[in-house]
């Protein structure tokens, strides 16, 4: 007797814990990518050195400013939530901290300020905050995509591209965990 109850993709429940787990995995991949791009391997190699352009500094510094603003925004949002909702906010905030650190680490001495004021959001519980934060994630991802079009160095482009994919996951997780549908995530609503 088969007691397995298959659920379709549309009817499968999406828990905040499952979304949290996917965000953890995505954040870890960005942290590793940031460290890998900044690694200095002394072993001789026959391949060409990775492309690193000093012309990317201004663009990357603008991304640091945006990511620092996201950190401040999530830190401010923590006061409005608790429990699992707080865990989600703290996790995403930690990803943005990692992005600031990765971008600043890549730039080294050319990195600018790593703090910025919070972006405006209306105070409220998780169901009020999550859609607003998702919208900020979408705007932040769009800023990274626009920056990617101008970045010349391969290492910088790789780092920024790795951040974009996680920012998109942040947006989706926030929308879904606040009660949005898969369709709203796919259409960006």
Pin down the residues of each PLM region.
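All-alpha RGS (Regulator of G-protein Signaling) helical domain and cognate RGS-like helical scaffolds
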Residues: 2-14, 21-189
């Amino acid at each position: 007797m088969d007691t397995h109850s298959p659920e379709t993709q549309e009817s499968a429940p999406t828990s905040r814990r499952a979304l949290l787990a996917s965000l953890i995995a995505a954040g870890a991949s960005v942290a590793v990518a940031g460290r890998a791009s900044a690694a200095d391997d002394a072993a001789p190699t026959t391949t060409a050195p990775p492309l690193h352009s000093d012309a990317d500094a201004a663009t990357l510094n603008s991304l640091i400013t945006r990511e620092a603003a996201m950190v401040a925004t999530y830190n401010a949002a923590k006061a409005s939530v608790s429990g699992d909702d707080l865990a989600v906010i703290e996790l995403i905030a930690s990803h943005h901290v990692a992005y600031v650190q990765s971008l600043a680490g890549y730039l080294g001495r050319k990195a600018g300020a790593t703090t910025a004021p919070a972006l405006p959001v209306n105070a409220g519980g998780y169901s009020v905050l999550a859609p607003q934060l998702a919208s900020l994630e979408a705007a932040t991802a769009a800023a990274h995509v626009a920056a990617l079009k101008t970045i010349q160095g391969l290492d910088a482009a790789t780092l920024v591209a790795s951040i974009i994919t996680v920012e998109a996951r942040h947006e989706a997780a926030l929308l879904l965990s606040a009660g949005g549908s898969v369709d709203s995530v796919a259409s960006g609503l």
